[in-house]
A protein has these predicted regions:
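Regulatory loop-to-helix N-cap segments in sensory/regulatory domains
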Residues: 115-133, 140-141
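Signal-transducing coupling segments at domain and membrane junctions
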Residues: 74-95
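Soluble sensory domains of the PAS superfamily and closely related sensory modules
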Residues: 60-69, 76-79
Length: 141
């Protein structure tokens, strides 16, 4: 859907981050696959990545509870070894804002804004932009 791609690209452009993904709760063997993404130059796609089991990731558990996660320094966020393997698999994930898309109180999709390489301090405007992007995606789904 081109409108969803436009929302993700606008979020990427306004923040100067590395990657924005939309994961949707779809039928199948892999929980919340990436269905749409916007990438900065040279950043690897996650659309075909299937080695990370999101059902056990601490951030995914927060999404299931309907809570946004803001990490300025993902390396310090959790002690969980699987989380740190995911960070490396995702290209050196250093900071992120992860926002649930809710419908009838249930998480139906997830918008993730990733910064690769080095931590970064997210601004209130960037956090609000993620919230607004997730709300807009929810309207489009």
């Amino acid at each position: 859907m081109a409108e969803i791609d436009d929302v993700l690209q606008a979020l990427l452009s306004s923040t100067g981050a590395s990657r924005v993904t939309l994961r949707q709760d779809l039928p199948g063997d892999y929980a919340f696959p990436v269905t749409h993404e916007a990438l900065a130059a040279g950043v690897r796609s996650l659309k075909e990545e299937r080695t990370v089991d999101l059902r056990t990731q601490p951030v995914a558990l927060e999404m299931a509870a309907g809570r946004q996660v803001v990490q300025d320094d993902s390396a310090r966020a959790y002690d969980d070894p699987a989380f740190h393997r995911m960070r490396e698999t995702y290209g050196g994930l250093a900071a992120q804002i992860v926002t649930p898309v809710l419908a009838d109180g249930r998480t139906v999709a997830i918008v993730s804004l990733h910064q690769l390489g080095s931590p970064r301090r997210w601004t209130e405007d960037e956090i609000e932009a993620c919230t607004a992007a997730a709300a807009r995606v929810g309207q489009l789904l």
